[in-house]
Curated annotation (Swiss-Prot):
Composition-biased stretches (Basic and acidic residues): 100-115
PTM-bearing positions, type N6-methyllysine: 84
Keyword field: Methylation, Ribonucleoprotein, Ribosomal protein
Protein name stated in the entry: Large ribosomal subunit protein bL12
CC annotations in GO: cytosolic large ribosomal subunit
Keyword Ribonucleoprotein: yes
Record organism: Halophilic eubacterium NRCC 41227
Amino acid sequence: MALTQEDIINAVAEMSVMEVAELVSAMEEKFGVSAAAAVVAGPGGGEAEEAEEQTEFDLVLTSAGEKKVNVIKVVREITGLGLKEAKAAVDGAPATLKEGMSKEDGDEAKTKLEEAGASVELK
């Protein structure tokens, strides 16, 4: 009686991780192949390409620093928030101040906040 593909899958599903690793090693030896070669042959660089193509950034305040009042002023200027909301955002760091910014606008806002004494990231 021949084993079906489903029987093999069920048998592998019941194995421990160590047993599966041993099975893979035995198959590599039997058929003269390497499991690592299959990984290399797969499509690669998908995440790197996406990172290069990113056009919208989020401005994230990671820390207000020593000069919190100056940072609040710049946050109000960049976001258009009122004093109370800007203070809450600065006190609640890390906080996303603005989403979907262009690279140029994000860099400009980041520079202003860093000059005011804040720590900022563009994500």
